[in-house]
Amino acid sequence: MSCLHVSSRSLPLDSLPRRGVGIISRPRPTLARIVTTPTWVPVLVATFLIIASLLLAFAVTDVGRQAFVDQWERSRLAFGQSLDDTEYARMEARSASLAPLYALGSALVTVLIPFIVAGTVRLALRPTEGATPSFGQVLAVLSHANVVLALRQVVATPVAFVRESLSSATTVVQLVPSLDETSPLARFFGGVDLFVVWWIVVAALGLSILYRRPARQLVASMTLAYLV
């Protein structure tokens, strides 16, 4: 299987912490170096551990357990399922064991995202002349983009603890608190996570290097897919 060779400085690949900082501060040159020696396991494990440890630390507190119960209640109501006092009390009683499992499951989802998106990208984007990236290169780009999701959890966890809620900690709606919560615009902004958009931008920058396509075009396409 042929791989794309990207011209960059002939320096050894930076350490994992330096790559993480580079993804945040200088994503394009960092990704240009990453795709020359694509690795994805270390960064995927590291970001998973960060996200999982923060979610679990929150889930074992009284505030965290109650926040998870409230989240479950909102999810059931969103699907039109009523919840009486007995069922709510049962959820509270089981929260000590279920909240950590829910937190761990949420962290595992972030591990699956790069694989799912990588598979989709391989199907949707045809290699251009002179650009035939391998699956490993695509996966390396998307896995390093998960640094943004780890940073998201670093920000969201203390906010969730203060607000005693898991909802809308890093969404656009937080920037416009004057909006009526029941308005269509508020509901739309409540579903747009700033860090997910950042993740898309970082991923698109890396994919633009691999597939030699305009980054803006990829950002627009991926953002549209996210919003839809």
Named regions from a protein language model:
Residues 1-11:
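Short, intrinsically disordered terminal tails adjacent to the first/last structured region
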Residues 9-25, 94, 132:
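Short, membrane-interfacial amphipathic segments enriched in basic
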Residues 13, 102-109, 185-190:
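Short alpha-helical transmembrane interface motifs in multi-pass membrane proteins
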Residues 13-21, 80-88, 165-168:
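Charged, low-complexity, helix/coiled-coil-prone segments
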Residues 17-20, 43-44, 104-107, 111, ...:
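Alpha-helical transmembrane segments
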Residues 25, 29-151:
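Selected alpha-helical membrane-embedding segments in polytopic membrane proteins
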Residues 136-228:
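Hydrophobic alpha-helical transmembrane segments and adjacent short intramembrane/lumenal linkers
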